[in-house]
C-alpha cells in the first residue's frame, strides 16, 4: 500500500511540476506596431486581430487576413483604400505592401515584431506606446 501511495505521489508531483515550466506564448493581437523606418510625418502601422490584420501604409489604410503556424506567418487577401498621395509616399507604400504579401515568418521579442519575407527582407516594428490619459 505504501508503494502505491508513494508511486501516486511521485506521479502527481511530476504532473504538477510540468505545468510550472510551460510558458504562454506572447500574442501579437490587440497591439499596434509602428514600422521602425517610419518618420514623424508618415507613421506606417500594422495591427492584428483574430484572423485579420490592418494598418496605415503612409497614404492608405490596408487590411487582409493572416494565419500563424509556429513561427510561420502568411498574410493574404491584402487590400487597401485607393487614395492618391505624393509620389515618393506612394512608391514607399507600394514597396511596403508588396513586402507584406511575401512575409513567411515572424518573431516577437518583447515590444519588437519582426516580419521576414521569402527574400530575407525584414520589416521591423516597435509596439506603439499608448498615449497617457490626462487627469
Label every PLM stretch briefly:
Residues 17-135:
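Lipid interaction determinants
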Amino acid at each position: 500500500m505504501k508503494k502505491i501511495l508513494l508511486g501516486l505521489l511521485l506521479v502527481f508531483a511530476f504532473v504538477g511540476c510540468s505545468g510550472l515550466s510551460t510558458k504562454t506564448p506572447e500574442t501579437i493581437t490587440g497591439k499596434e506596431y509602428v514600422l521602425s523606418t517610419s518618420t514623424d510625418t508618415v507613421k506606417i502601422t500594422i495591427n492584428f486581430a483574430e484572423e485579420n490584420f490592418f494598418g496605415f501604409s503612409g497614404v492608405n489604410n490596408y487590411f487582409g487576413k493572416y494565419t500563424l503556424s509556429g513561427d510561420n506567418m502568411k498574410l493574404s487577401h491584402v487590400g487597401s483604400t485607393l487614395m492618391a498621395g505624393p509620389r515618393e509616399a506612394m512608391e514607399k507604400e507600394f514597396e511596403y505592401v508588396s513586402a507584406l504579401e511575401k512575409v513567411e515568418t515572424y518573431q516577437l521579442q518583447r515590444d519588437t515584431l519582426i516580419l521576414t519575407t521569402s527574400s530575407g527582407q525584414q520589416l521591423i516594428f516597435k509596439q506603439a506606446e499608448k498615449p497617457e490619459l490626462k487627469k
